[in-house]
Amino acid sequence: MSAEGVSEIEESQIQTNYDKVVYKFDDMNLKDELLKGVYGYGFEEPSAIQQRAILPIVEEHDVLAQAQSGTGKTGTFSIAALQRIDSSIKAPQALILAPTRELALQIQKVVIALAFHMDVKVHACIGGTSFVEDTEGLKDAQIVVGTPGRVSDNIQRHRFKTDNIKMFILDEADEMLSSGFREQIYQIFTMLPPTTQVVLLSATLPGDVLEVTTKFMRNPIRILVKKDELTLEGIKQFYINVEEEQYKFDCLSDLYDSISVTQAVIFCNTRRKVEELTQKLTESNFTVSSIYSDLPQQERDVIMKEFRSGSSRILISTDLLARGIDVQQVSLVINYDLPTNKENYIHRIGRGGRFGRKGVAINFVTNEDVGAMREIEKFYSTQIEELPADVAEMFT
C-alpha cells in the first residue's frame, strides 16, 4: 500500500478548519519504532487525509474526517492511536469501533502491522469469539478494536476496564451513527472517561450525522472532502437496463460469456436473493461463494479466506461486505440490485479499485430502478454510462 496506490484528492476539494498540512511522515514527530512500522508497512508519503488528520488527532483534538474508501483512512487513525498510547501501561487506552466484525479484523491487522516494532497489544472484541478470549485479551491490550454490541456487553460485564481510555475512534461513522447503532454508541460513550478524545472517520457524512456528532464532540477539527469528489477515482461505472427483474440472471450469464474476469463481487439486497443467485450460478458451473450477516462467524471467515486466496472467483454478498473489506484482486463489482441506501453505493463500488487499482462497476437496472440510479448520480455528482458493446476489451 504505497502512496502511489492511494487515491489522490485535489487541494481544492479539501475543506477544513485546521491549517496544518504535513507532507512527510518524517515531519510528524512520530516515535522512531512507529515510523519504522509505517515505512515497513509500505507507506511512502502520507495521503491527503493523512497529511491533514494525523497531527490534530495526535494533538488530542476531537476530529471529524471525511475521506472516500481507498484514501488511507485506516492508516490515519491507526498511526495517530499508536503515537498517542503509552506502551508501558498495560491497559486499554484507545477504543476503535467498526460496524462489522470483518472490518474490525481488517483494522486490527493494519494496527498490528504498523506496531510491528512496538511493544503494543491489539485485541479484537467481536462476536463469534469466546468471552474467555475477551477477558484475557482485554486485560493488557493497549488498543481495542471491536463492534458496538460486543464492546458494550464487555464494558457492562466489567470485563473491559475503561479507566485508561483516552481515544474513542469510530470508523465508517455514517453507518455507526445510523439508527441501528446510534444508541449503542451513546451507551458506550457514557461509560468512557469524560475527557476521552473522539475521532470519527467515514466516506460519507450526511447532515443528520453531522448533527448527531455535536452531541458528543467538543469543537472538532473538521476535514471534509467535498461531496462531488466522493466517487472513486479509477472506477468505471456502467449500467445495463435489464428492464424486468426476471431478466437479471440471463443478463449476468451473457455478461460472463463475453468477459474474462479474475474475481468479482456481486451485491444483492437480501439474503434470499444471495442464496437464489448462488444456487443458479453453481448450477451453471460457476465457482461461487456467498456471505451474509446471518452466516455463522466461522463460515464467514473461511469464505473470506477462500476468496482472498483466489480459490473462489465470485463472491455474492449483501451490504455486509460493502464497508472496508480489503480484497485487492477484485476488478469487477456488479450491483445485481441497486443499493436501497444510496450512501452504500460508494462502499460497494469501492471494492473494485481500492488504493489506485482500476476497477469496473456494473449496475443491473430494471425500469423501476432508473429513478433510483439517477438519484445516485445526482448524490455523487457522477455519471453512470450505459455498458458499451465492446465491454470485453476492458478486461483484457
UniProtKB/Swiss-Prot annotation:
Q: Which GO terms describe its cellular component?
A: cytoplasm
Motif DEAD box: list the residue ranges: 171-174
Which UniProt keywords are present, listed alphabetically? Answer: ATP-binding, Cytoplasm, Helicase, Hydrolase, Initiation factor, Nucleotide-binding, Protein biosynthesis, RNA-binding
Residues annotated as binding ATP are: 67-74
Keyword check for Ribosomal protein: no
Q: Where is the motif Q motif annotated in this sequence? A: 23-51
Q: List each copy of the Helicase C-terminal domain by range.
A: 234-395
Q: Which family does this protein fall into? A: Belongs to the DEAD box helicase family. eIF4A subfamily.
Q: What does this protein do?
A: ATP-dependent RNA helicase which is a subunit of the eIF4F complex involved in cap recognition and is required for mRNA binding to ribosome. In the current model of translation initiation, eIF4A unwinds RNA secondary structures in the 5'-UTR of mRNAs which is necessary to allow efficient binding of the small ribosomal subunit, and subsequent scanning for the initiator codon.
Q: Which PANTHER family match?
A: ATP-DEPENDENT RNA HELICASE DBP3
Domain note for this entry?
A: The Q motif is unique to and characteristic of the DEAD box family of RNA helicases and controls ATP binding and hydrolysis.
The name under which this protein is listed is: ATP-dependent RNA helicase eIF4A
